[in-house]
UniProtKB/Swiss-Prot annotation:
Homopentamer. InterPro entries: Mechanosensitive_channel_CS, MS_channel, MSC/AndL, MscL_channel. SUPFAM superfamilies: Gated mechanosensitive channel. This is Large-conductance mechanosensitive channel. GO terms for molecular function: mechanosensitive monoatomic ion channel activity. The keyword Transmembrane applies. The chain crosses the membrane at residues 8-28, 30-50, 67-87.
Length: 129
């Protein structure tokens, strides 16, 4: 049982996922700070000096804080866009890596097979003459 768990836990995909979650959490904090400290104050200035996070509406005894929802929505959009750009960059890098691997010099086996093919073609051409 322990051996199976160890194989599962230390496979590349699980470790990659763990690193991704940790980096995602750290990145989320950076984006939250960017939105809270820079974007929302700028949006507040643009719409007339209003603190966007404090926007709310009272409905009966309830206070609906739609400003906080707006701020969280902007954070989500920025995080999603940044992750989109990151994944797009990674995919472009992988495609570039794959093309360089495809262009790599032929192996010894491939060279030998090419020579054999060429020799067979020459033999066939000589027989037809």
């Amino acid at each position: 049982m322990f051996k199976a768990f160890k194989e599962f836990a230390f496979r590349g995909n699980v470790i990659d996922l763990a690193v991704g979650v940790i980096l995602g959490a750290a990145f989320s904090g950076i984006i939250k700070s960017l939105v809270d400290s820079i974007f929302m104050p700028l949006i507040g200035i643009i719409i007339g000096g209003i603190d966007v996070k404090g926007l709310s509406v009272e409905v009966g005894n309830a206070n609906l804080l739609y400003g906080q929802f707006l701020q969280a929505s902007i954070e989500f959009i920025l995080i999603a866009f940044a992750l989109f750009l990151f994944v797009k960059g990674i995919n472009a890098f992988r495609r570039k890596e794959e093309t360089t691997e495809e262009v790599a010099a032929p192996t010894t086996e491939e060279k030998l097979l090419t020579e054999i093919r060429d020799a067979l073609v020459r033999q066939q051409n000589e027989r037809m003459k």
